[in-house]
Amino acid sequence: MVYHVSESTKVRTMDYSMSPISDDDRESIMDVFNYYVENSFAAYPETKLPYEAYDMFLKISKGYPTAAVKDKKGSLIGFGLLRVHNSMPTFSKTAEITYFIHPEHTGKGIGTKLLNHLEEEAKKKGITNILANISSLNPRSIDFHKKNGFIECGRFKRVGMKNGQVFDTVWMQKIT
């Protein structure tokens, strides 16, 4: 699948493709994830994860939609995945979402296209609820989700601490 993204402030068009994540994406995905580990509250670990931690992404997303977003040269510019929310069959129609866009490519509509792609793939699997778990210290993500149809459905106060800063976890939900 190839998408064309045009920014109103720029004349050029950027081509990129989405395909399921694979072992070939290990280092690139971990590099993008670790950028957010070190520079934001978007990823919760306090220190970079080793490349072997990629196996965790594969394990938690097994049987769920995933996507690696690559530019026309084949370089990874983002990734996303859905994962189990609760392993009980009662919750089989609910999934949690995780996605990260390379910092040089944010604000270009790629995150929205990735979210839409994952939502469409989720519908094909019968998933009707998508949950996002977001740090209260990540207002851009909260705003992004609101703009894309998520509503805040819960907040756990002062449950996280990263780099000495305490934060809430904000739970957002989109019913597809």
List the predicted regions and their residue ranges:
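Conserved acetyl-CoA-binding loop-helix of GNAT-fold acetyltransferases
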Residues: 107-124, 143-147
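A short beta-loop-alpha structural element at the N-terminal edge
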Residues: 15-29
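Acetyl-CoA-dependent GNAT
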Residues: 46-104, 115, 175
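Active-site acidic-Proline motif in GNAT/NAT acetyltransferases
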Residues: 99-104, 108, 120, 136-137
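Conserved catalytic-core motifs of GNAT/GCN5-like acyltransferases
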Residues: 84, 131-134, 151-168
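Conserved beta-strand-loop-alpha-helix junction that forms the acyl-donor binding cleft
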Residues: 132-142
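Conserved GNAT acetyl-CoA-binding A-motif
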Residues: 122-134
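Helix-loop element at the rim of GNAT/NAT acetyltransferase active sites that forms part
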Residues: 31-48, 57
